[in-house]
């Protein structure tokens, strides 16, 4: 069970697909009691497979991860790729081992990141790529003929946890226009709000905001101009205008 459990449940019911919705203990017991050859496919969940399951000779586990491992192991990798202004990002299918996102790579797919992409739009693109990659590799996985690539742990980055956010969720007015754009788009998970609302400080007051707009245009104002008016904060810098709206004073 995970944050997407309601969506998955509705999808299964709509398409008449049998499903089980189990808590962690029940799921672990289910896996431990399996005695036939089993392939477990892990997609977008928080469940960490214990060694008691991974050590069973009849069980293999593959996992979909939203990054080009060994970059960005852990949670919300798409946000970090955007925030860090990566030019290329992608997905990985890999075997599961005890160390999070450290198993041998089965396949990867990549795409170029544009200055318009958000975490939400990247997730949608990843879903399509992950399915296409799965179709390509599933036969090899079942036949155990995959030519895997072992990860280079010298290139492995620190694990990102679910509570971590780009710059702790705070917009920094000292950033360049490119950095502001990257931050806004990284925090943007649309209706999912995976990282919560971003915020900024203005005149000693903390504001959260739920909407933004990025406009690329020639500006006659000095770089770094800030204006708070009609519940909107406008930032003009380096021929970009950032409009932050639906502001509310944070507690």
Features from the language model and the residues they span:
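Low-complexity, glycine/alanine/valine/leucine- and proline-rich hydrophobic stretches
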Residues: 213-242, 249
